[in-house]
Swiss-Prot record:
It is found in: Cytoplasm. Belongs to the cornifin (SPRR) family. The gene is Sprr2d. Induction: Up-regulated by estrogen in the uterus of ovariectomized animals, with strongly increased expression detected in luminal epithelial cells at 6 and 12 hours after hormone injection. One of its GO terms (cellular component) is cornified envelope. Pfam families: SPRR2. Expressed in uterus. One of its GO terms (biological process) is female gonad development. The keyword Repeat applies. This is Small proline-rich protein 2D. It comes from Mus musculus (Mouse). Its main location: cytoplasm. Keywords: Cytoplasm, Keratinization, Repeat. Transmembrane segments: none annotated. Residues 1-11 have a biased composition (Low complexity).
Amino acid sequence: MSYQQQQCKQPCQPPPVCPPKKCPEPCPPLKCPEPCPPPKCPEPCPPPKCPEPCPEPCPPPSCQQKCPPAQPPPPCQQKCPPKSK
C-alpha cells in the first residue's frame, strides 16, 4: 500500500472548533459636514456701457477743387495800328 492510501484511510478528524467570528464594530454613521453656505452671488455686472457714438465722419477733403473751365483768351479786339516802316 502506498503512503497516500494509508493516509487516506485514517479516520477524519472533526473540524476544529472555530471561535465565533467577532464582527468589527459597525462604522459610525458618516458625520455630514456643515451644509455649505449658499453660494454668494457676485455683484451683478453693471450694464455694458455703450461707447460714445462716433462723431460724424469728416467730409472727404475737397481736393478736387473745381477749377473754372479754362477759357480761351478773349480775342484781341484792339485794332493794332498799321505797321509803319
